Amino acid sequence: MPRGSEAGYCCLSRDSNMPDSRDDQQQGASLGTSQDNSQTSSLIDGQTLSKESPSHGLELSAPEKARAASLDGAEEALWTTRADGRVRLRLEPFCTQRPYTVHQMFYEALDKYGNLSALGFKRKDKWERISYYQYYLIARKVAKGFLKLGLERAHSVAILGFNSPEWFFSAVGTVFAGGIVTGIYTTSSPEACQYISHDCRANVIVVDTQKQLEKILKIWKDLPHLKAVVIYQEPPPKKMANVYTMEELIELGQEVPEEALDAIIDTQQPNQCCVLVYTSGTTGNPKGVMLSQDNITWTARYGSQAGDIQPAEVQQEVVVSYLPLSHIAAQIYDLWTGIQWGAQVCFADPDALKGTLVNTLREVEPTSHMGVPRVWEKIMERIQEVAAQSGFIRRKMLLWAMSVTLEQNLTCPSNDLKPFTSRLADYLVLARVRQALGFAKCQKNFYGAAPMTAETQRFFLGLNIRLYAGYGLSESTGPHFMSSPYNYRLYSSGRVVPGCRVKLVNQDADGIGEICLWGRTIFMGYLNMEDKTCEAIDSEGWLHTGDMGRLDADGFLYITGRLKELIITAGGENVPPVPIEEAVKMELPIISSAMLIGDQRKFLSMLLTLKCTLDPETSEPTDSLTEQAVEFCQRVGSKASTVSEIVGQRDEAVYQAIHEGIQRVNANAAARPYHIQKWAILQRDFSISGGELGPTMKLKRLTVLEKYKDIIDSFYQEQKQ
């Protein structure tokens, strides 16, 4: 949409000599400004919101009402690399859902859920909530503010901050204004922020704290498209041109007529880009995954239905938002699915992954919850530590209850009529454990983004907590396969979402092949990367995932590894690393991380880390072993309580026990080339700050290979002589 007088308003230009908007006296009543905006934006002040009229901007415009399922001027191509491009949607005869936009999805939600609580946030130790009407109105105000700052069509608003209502307002407002939502991980370096912000042509960057603002100020000179920065959690340290608080953004947006925003909304089509998700990029720069409005609205509806997420008419889902919204799984689950079904989304503290998450879970009591495998593993380790410190009787009761329940869930997983002993175990012990975790009302617990060990899945089954897997990529808008209470098989990633398709190519004798996907979930293309897009999407429009898997007779998918992770030894043997790594961790409960090595080598070797406690302030691995690891040491005759004692002094008892455990794994291997012949224990567990784990705690294998190159080379030195 053209900017300037034709639209009935003018844009603010990026001008360092421009008077700062804070020089004008703010009108507290109209903005709802609070004195405590160092803690949270006054946009979510309860008293201010209660005065808002929900009538403004809620009438669906004629163009939106008249928009048919067929798209005007739909392009022939199934992919594009242009931010302003359009694609042909993968419409199927057996999936008749008409394509619709994010605004249409929100508008339809208002009709059903307008008065329900949409977002919950903590303020001064008290939970406050806003309704879907209020949510929608604020998003419109933010959209008008972005337009006033000069947001151009098919340019981005980048968001650099922890999960919060303002993150949601900014994301939805961006789409309403015709922009593209681009999340940036809070852990990103200034250089990473610069690359993403430049690549997506960010006109506006939204940050939460002064720390994140400093990153942007360092790189602003290298961002030719950037016109303004908006900060919401903390005030700027001083007055700066083109840096605004969220309240000032809202005030600026008042100059933009509602009709101007409606005109932009009316022109939006489902096959246009509205979200960019940047992959972590283990090699080279991250790729910008372009997602269309149809990708978002279709997945929010059907991907969640496959996971048995309920519409609020049946039961309002309550979820806790804490995983990075820059990741597609969290963004789809928390933000877009929430709007689709009228869920109540409650925001955890920024330090949730450092130990406070369980406090939020207890207070909110979610009905469904999602965590990456590492989060579930940390919960498991915490339960094991508490159990180890409990009295003899309580510990034995827990072990008995978990043993009885696990056996029941393994032998009769779908039997609702539990034996008396199972019901007694749940009543006396397990229900209390779930309540202590905040899962008393949680009916669906999901995981994704990385493989989960069999040990972790069996542990939670013993607590009567089924972990439902989903499988997909950023390139498939998240879930393409889903598990649910009615669609579950242990160790599988579920079945294909209705309306989507899957095929396995280049299958081996065991039926394992590369997983290829088709459907409304498939992305538009990689921004500005035609070669990479053509590598991912073939001539028939199938997405080649690079993941290996097999399908059973009932259509359940089992992931066996990644093509790029597949180890091809010097002898030509193809070795998937994940099953061997999981076997080692299952055999040796002292092991935290295991990474198999051997690509183009004569034999396999392995790097190991030990289970250690995390610093409560930084979430960094410490030198102290967990209670479970200490118990392991005691069982094998060691008095060690720290990693340095074991590695630095080469504790004979522990090293011998690990050697014997690996020998047991080797004994169960399919053939000798699958044997682990050498291994080493590292002095520090893998972590995000150490570079071995990505933002969702997925193992970054290439980084590990480079970081520990000297140790790895030492395994094979004898072979070179």
From Swiss-Prot:
Top-level taxonomic group: Eukaryota
Residues modified to Phosphotyrosine: Y655
Region named Disordered: 1-64
Signal peptide from the UniProt entry: none
Keywords: ATP-binding, Cell membrane, Cytoplasm, Cytoplasmic vesicle, Endoplasmic reticulum, Fatty acid metabolism, Ligase, Lipid metabolism, Membrane, Microsome, Nucleotide-binding, Phosphoprotein
Outcome reported for the amino acid change (mutating G281A): Abolishes enzyme activity
Class of the enzyme per the UniProt entry, highest EC level: ligase
One example GO MF annotation: very long-chain fatty acid-CoA ligase activity
GO biological-process terms attached to the record: long-chain fatty acid metabolic process; response to glucocorticoid; very long-chain fatty acid metabolic process
Catalysed transformations (reactions): a long-chain fatty acid + ATP + CoA = a long-chain fatty acyl-CoA + AMP + diphosphate; (E)-hexadec-2-enoate + ATP + CoA = (2E)-hexadecenoyl-CoA + AMP + diphosphate; hexadecanoate + ATP + CoA = hexadecanoyl-CoA + AMP + diphosphate
This protein's name: Long-chain-fatty-acid--CoA ligase ACSBG1
Taxonomic lineage: Eukaryota, Metazoa, Chordata, Craniata, Vertebrata
Subcellular location(s) of the protein: Cytoplasm; Cytoplasmic vesicle; Microsome; Endoplasmic reticulum
Family: Belongs to the ATP-dependent AMP-binding enzyme family. Bubblegum subfamily.
Binding residue positions for ATP: 279-287, 469-474, 547, 562, 698
Ranges of compositional bias, category Polar residues: 26-52
Pfam family name, one: AMP-binding_C_3
Modified residues (Phosphoserine): S34, S50, S53, S70
Gene3D superfamilies in alphabetical order: N-terminal domain of ligase-like
EC number: 6.2.1.3
Species per Swiss-Prot/TrEMBL record: Mus musculus (Mouse)
